[in-house]
A protein has these predicted regions:
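Catalytic domains of riboflavin
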Residues: 1-308
Length: 308
């Protein structure tokens, strides 16, 4: 049986205007729900053609949908069908659209391809579209597959990694019985049609390996009764949460360094609650690090203490 390709191979084909197959494996968990091994045909929206849309509709058995970042859809004033509207496993669904200058009703492969390209065109404005139409947009969660491991987020992530607009087109692949195709079928399907195939799991690993996922917001010395620490304030680009690194002494020597991962506890750390020992643990860590001469405390906020 043919195997999976690398994310790098998939990116190269996407940049050359080809379709790829994107698979979430059976053990993938999305929004707390068990995945079913679903596979999707995917390509960059800006390179979509009538032939590619026709292929998706004939071979995937499903009408193609457009996936895009939240910011991109908001700029085009494309909103949810109803506030909070969600499709299967949490996919966020928008109101269907047609490009205003489609030749016919918008249902043909040519018209759908035009609408999809318009949705990815940086020059497009809300006035370029009419609603309802025949192309349904799906809104990706900020943070992509590192926030939600779905096809919507994966396709937008791949588009961005491919240096394209954050807009893609996907279509779920069905087998001959009309059911969602399983992984062996998807591997054979990709091999038969010469498509690269990769998993969302591998995309998650690729992003974690190649991207810097935190940003330094501020740095400041902080005198304490245990000595002077340097405080580094970071913000996660995935969940937008703040993280604090309290550094004491020189930790760049390559020698083993004391490190504490501390779950932030307002009541224990700052208010002196006797219902937990969080504050005591933090002070003890600062004291031990000062005695050792160097070390780091990573302070993770929004992890409230046990006892309140």
């Amino acid at each position: 049986m043919p195997g999976f390709n690398t994310i790098e191979d998939v990116i190269e084909d996407l940049q050359n205007g080809r379709m790829v197959v994107l698979v979430d494996e059976r053990d993938t968990d999305i929004d707390g729900q068990e995945a079913v091994g679903e596979g999707e045909l995917m390509m960059l929206a800006e390179l979509t053609t009538a032939d590619s849309i026709n292929f998706m509709m004939r071979h995937a058995g499903n009408p193609p949908m457009v996936t895009a970042s939240k910011e991109h859809l908001e700029a085009l004033e494309l909103h949810h069908t109803v506030p909070g509207a969600q499709g299967p496993r949490g996919a966020s669904i928008g109101v269907s659209v047609n490009a205003r200058d489609t030749e016919n009703t918008g249902v043909s492969a040519q018209d759908r391809a035009l609408t999809i390209r318009k949705l990815s065109d940086p020059a497009s404005t809300p006035e370029n579209f009419i609603q309802p139409g025949h192309v349904t947009p799906l809104r990706a969660q900020p943070g992509g597959v590192l926030r939600r491991a779905g096809h919507t987020e994966a396709s937008v992530d791949l588009a961005q990694i491919a240096d394209s607009r954050p807009v893609a087109v996907i279509a779920a692949i069905l087998d001959e019985t009309g059911k969602l195709a399983d992984t062996p079928y998807l591997l054979d399907f990709a091999h038969e049609h010469g498509f690269k195939i990769a998993t969302i799991h591998d995309l998650i690993a690729h992003r974690r390996r190649t991207e810097k996922l935190i940003h330094l917001e501020a740095k400041s010395p902080m005198p304490t009764r245990f000595g002077e620490f340097t405080v580094y304030a970071y913000r996660s680009l995935v969940d937008d949460n703040p993280y604090i690194a309290m550094v004491y002494g020189d930790v760049s020597s390559g020698e083993p360094t004391l490190v504490r991962m501390h779950s932030g506890c307002l009541t224990g750390d700052a208010l002196g609650s006797l219902l937990c020992d969080c504050g005591e643990q933090l002070e003890r860590s600062m004291r031990l690090i000062a005695v050792a001469g160097s070390g780091v405390i990573v302070y993770i906020q929004h992890h409230e203490g046990r006892g309140i």
